[in-house]
A protein has these predicted regions:
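Sec-dependent signal peptide cleavage junction
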Residues: 38-48
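N-terminal substrate-binding region of glycoside hydrolase catalytic domains
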Residues: 61, 80, 84, 145-237, ...
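Substrate-binding cleft of secreted/luminal carbohydrate-active enzymes
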Residues: 128, 149-151, 256, 374-458
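Aromatic- and acid-rich polysaccharide-binding/catalytic face
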Residues: 185-194, 311-353, 419-420
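Substrate-binding cleft of extracellular glycoside hydrolase catalytic domains
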Residues: 197-299
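Glycoside hydrolase catalytic-domain groove-lining segments
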Residues: 203-220, 328-386
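Aromatic-lined carbohydrate-recognition surfaces of secreted/lumenal glycan-active proteins
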Residues: 288-309, 372-385, 418-421
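Long, low-complexity serine/threonine/glycine- and acidic-rich segments characteristic of extracellular
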Residues: 458-548
């Protein structure tokens, strides 16, 4: 029955009909602007002398001469740069930048690509191409490499004072099954699915072995009818069941996190923000009284339908202790049809080359930051397939990044739950794939800020290198840099002397500062990718007479 609950939810990640309709809507809007530009009425409205510039750009575009598209496009934009904005000017700027941003991406010039996309968004908004604006804004978020260097420090991560939040460190664990029971016993947090309307006490025989304080227990309280269940809750139909469930949760001898109706932003049977907030509030207010041992979790899917948002569903912040997300990073949209999809589709929904755990969590991180809440990954993973479309390596790489980089880039991530189950589509179970299991184990071992027990004391956290002072001896450096579809190489050097090169996440480097003389030194970190992307991060490393070192980004 718990299996049925999960598989029902998993189907949503494969559902693509609505997504494709939205994508075609974008393509239609983009084509419309070009047809308007080419009409005789529009041509007559353009300023005198424009035609040689426009003709040169159109000829380059027709020939797919990308070098000439950039050159002639820039000349055309320069001709129009000082003209007041109207539909003709906006159409020129929109079309040139829309045609050329993919060329900049291909060259690894993401600064110019984002500048072009910003013009797509600005001029698209003027022209009323709202879907194109949505696409451009999300693409700017997804293509940015966000290169940054971090250091492992003896300082604490941000602490929000939320119920059952570790002051430092990140709890890790998995969704429980009979098959993974022994592994779950050795981790800090364990998750169980319960559906609205069920007798929660029936799960006591599974939950009881994890009581006693050695584990945090996460309850994913799902709404089986999705939006229709929300309506029933608001009508009072589930009041008795809600009270019984909360009374049971009050008896659990362990810290409890309760996810109330997760993933509401992608439900097939949709609900409104106001309706969901009313249902959440109806449950949460009772929970505050009946089971004060329970922390309340508001948890969405990591991405919303095209043009959608998590924000409309967020209830009163006083009724939310943690902000959560379901975070799945898969190679293909459909496990049943493992083929590459439309690029903008995969970009928007974080699939394939865009399935980066850090970037896919960015919308959730923005929401949590706004309301000063810790983050929990309430379920997630990277599924693997076998046979001709084997995605084992892809899945292992994403698992490795999730457990080495998520709480480095987002130190407010205080819990991660792996969806350790198999199904008819993607398989997320660790025990069924030795390569994925090894990546999971290796990542856990390499990250000293991950907690195998809620009682574990974590004394370290990752900080952006530019914020590090008072370090000494060997300093552990790591980097984050995601270049779409590329293998990144990170090279470290001090005063021109090579220190290390890494090609796998988290690009670890052990910098022995004891070998440096007192005074100022230059640490250079270079991120390269085969498509031509290159970014150099320079830091002034200052070593004091007592041996302590500090870093300042140049």
């Amino acid at each position: 029955m718990v299996y049925h609950c999960r598989m029902q939810t998993a189907w949503k990640y494969e559902k693509g009909v609505d997504t494709m309709k939205k994508q075609w809507k974008i393509i239609g809007a983009l084509g419309l602007s070009l047809s308007l530009l080419m009409s005789s009425t529009a041509l007559a409205a353009h300023p005198k002398g424009y035609w040689p510039y426009l003709s040169a750009f159109n000829n380059a575009k027709t020939a797919n001469n990308q070098a000439q598209m950039i050159t002639t496009g820039n000349k055309l934009l320069q001709y129009y740069q000082n003209l007041p904005l109207d539909s003709d000017v906006a159409s020129i700027r929109y079309n040139v930048n829309y045609a050329n941003y993919p060329i900049y991406e291909k060259q690894g010039n993401y600064t110019k690509a984002k500048e072009a996309l910003q013009q797509v968004a600005t001029n698209g908004a003027y022209l009323g191409f709202h879907d194109a604006v949505t696409m451009a804004n999300e693409r700017m978020r997804k293509i940015s490499p966000n290169a940054q260097v971090y250091a492992l420090t003896n300082t604490s991560a941000p602490y929000y004072g939320a119920k059952h939040e570790p002051k430092n460190g990140t709890l890790y664990g998995r969704v429980w099954t009979e098959q993974n029971d022994s592994a779950a016993q050795n981790e800090a947090i364990v998750s169980f699915y319960i559906e609205m309307g069920q007798n929660a006490a029936d799960y006591e025989r599974f939950i009881a072995p994890f009581e006693g304080g050695d584990h945090v227990i996460h309850i994913a309280w799902n709404f089986p009818g999705e939006g229709s269940t929300v309506s029933a809750i608001n009508s009072g139909s589930y009041d008795s069941n809600i009270q019984q469930t909360l009374q049971y949760l009050a008896t659990i001898d362990a810290p409890v996190l309760l996810r109330i109706g997760g993933e509401m932003n992608i439900w097939t049977t949709a609900t409104t923000g106001d309706a969901f907030k009313a249902a959440y509030t109806r449950i949460a207010k009772q929970a505050r009284t009946i089971c004060p041992n329970v922390a309340l979790v508001f948890s969405t899917n990591y991405t919303s339908p095209f043009g959608g948002s998590m924000e409309p569903y967020f209830p009163d912040a006083s009724l939310v202790d943690w902000v959560g997300a379901s975070l799945y990073n898969n190679k293909y949209q459909f496990a049943s049809s493992p083929t590459k999809g439309v690029d903008n589709n995969e970009m928007y929904f974080g699939i394939g080359d865009y399935a980066d755990p850090v970037k896919n969590l960015s919308h959730t991180a923005d929401l949590a930051k706004k309301y000063n809440k810790p983050i929990i990954i309430t379920e997630g993973g990277s599924g693997y397939l076998s046979g001709y479309a084997d995605t084992t390596t892809f899945a292992a790489d994403r698992i490795r990044e999730a457990y080495t980089s998520l709480n480095m880039v987002y130190p407010q991530v205080k819990a991660i739950i792996h969806f350790d189950r198999s199904g008819s589509g993607y398989d997320y179970s660790l025990q069924n794939n030795a390569t994925v299991q090894a990546a999971y184990n290796s990542a856990l071992k390499s990250n000293p800020t991950l907690m195998s027990s809620p009682s574990q004391t974590v004394t370290q956290s990752f900080k952006p290198l530019s914020q590090v002072t008072g370090a000494n001896g060997v300093v552990t450096l790591r980097a984050y840099c995601d270049v779409i579809g590329q293998t990144v190489t990170v090279t470290y050097s001090v005063d021109g002397k090579w220190v290390g090169t890494q090609k796998t996440v988290p690009y670890n480097c052990q910098l022995d500062t004891s070998t440096l003389t007192a005074g100022n030194h230059t640490l250079k970190v270079v991120c390269n990718a085969p498509n031509g992307y290159s970014q150099t991060l320079n830091y002034q490393l200052t070593k004091a007479a007592n041996g302590s070192v500090s870093f300042k980004q140049a």
